[in-house]
Amino acid sequence: MTLNSLPIFLVLISGIFCQYDYGPADDYGYDPFGPSTAVCAPECNCPLSYPTAMYCDNLKLKTIPIVPSGIKYLYLRNNMIEAIEENTFDNVTDLQWLILDHNHLENSKIKGRVFSKLKNLKKLHINYNNLTEAVGPLPKTLDDLQLSHNKITKVNPGALEGLVNLTVIHLQNNQLKTDSISGAFKGLNSLLYLDLSFNQLTKLPTGLPHSLLMLYFDNNQISNIPDEYFQGFKTLQYLRLSHNKLTDSGIPGNVFNITSLVELDLSFNQLKSIPTVSENLENFYLQVNKINKFPLSSFCKVVGPLTYSKITHLRLDGNNLTRADLPQEMYNCLRVAADISLE
């Protein structure tokens, strides 16, 4: 990974583990900021230390308050908001973050082009609502779209078209099927992070951008992977396919031999053998399958002073393997492995 890509990589990593850590006003049992600024909706908090942020969380609001001009960061989490009128944000053209998690929003009650009119919007989070399809149209400035834990069954063709700055999409925990998203992400050439876990996918979708760094398909119903599916993914580093229905016959020989890959999770499937992976792979999760043999060729094509597997963590617990099944020469191939779990 280059130094130039490290800052955005760290942002993505923090998004994985702290998806809802939006800022300094998270769910305090007291007011950590003191008095609000004079320019603020009376029921909300616009702290003096963060004068362009308005916090309206946990207020049982049914409608969005009037948002004063100059607000850039708007938090409306954990309310009872059901609708957004088209003119709701006409006064806040500088809005950059709009956080609407844990409300009662439905697509039919999000009116017109309410989001696309926000020409500076970068983050739109509508996790834990009642959406049945991806919202849109959206502004081209958007870089972070989170729609997880809804009831989304489709991403309409063109819904994400033109979002050239979009780097993060969360669509996990919805009701998406493969046909309803194939081609939906085409042209998103800045996309680095895509989470489609906990849906109803039976196949891998087509048209994913090759810019992806992190790709999550865990907890679906995927049984096979097309040959050369990941060909062209030159920067893919994290791939999760755990809790699916993968078998040996559904995995072409070298489909996971991706030189950029750092972490691969194939745990909780129905594999009997270990797929071939790149010698650059560092973390490999295969626990709870039906694996009964340990071919070194899955990890090392050739073993020598400078040619060996870079795997540091290998999980094989919950399979049909014991220490006695591991070949002695394994330690030449997996010489940097710090942890090999079998039990």
Swiss-Prot record:
Tissue specificity field: Cornea and other tissues.
Pfam families xrefs: LRR_1 (PF00560), LRR_8 (PF13855), LRRNT (PF01462)
GO molecular function, one term: collagen binding
Domain LRRNT: 31-69
Keywords: Disulfide bond, Extracellular matrix, Glycoprotein, Leucine-rich repeat, Proteoglycan, Pyrrolidone carboxylic acid, Repeat, Secreted, Signal, Sulfation
LRR-type repeats, residues: 70-91, 94-117, 120-140, 141-162, 165-186, 190-211, 212-232, 235-255, 260-281, 282-301, 310-330
Compartments, as annotated in UniProt: Secreted, Extracellular space, Extracellular matrix
Keyword Disulfide bond belongs to the record: yes
Sequence positions bearing Sulfotyrosine: Y20, Y22
GO CC annotations on file: extracellular space
Repeat keyword on record: yes
Post-translational modification as stated in the protein's UniProt record: Contains keratan sulfate.
Membrane-spanning ranges: none
Signal sequence, renumbered to the chain: 1-18
Glycosylation site list: N91, N130, N165, N257, N320
Cystines in this chain: C300-C333
Modified residues (Pyrrolidone carboxylic acid): Q19
Subunit structure of this chain's protein: Binds to laminin.
Family that this chain belongs to: Belongs to the small leucine-rich proteoglycan (SLRP) family. SLRP class II subfamily.
Protein name (record): Lumican
Organism of provenance: Gallus gallus (Chicken)
Name of the gene: LUM
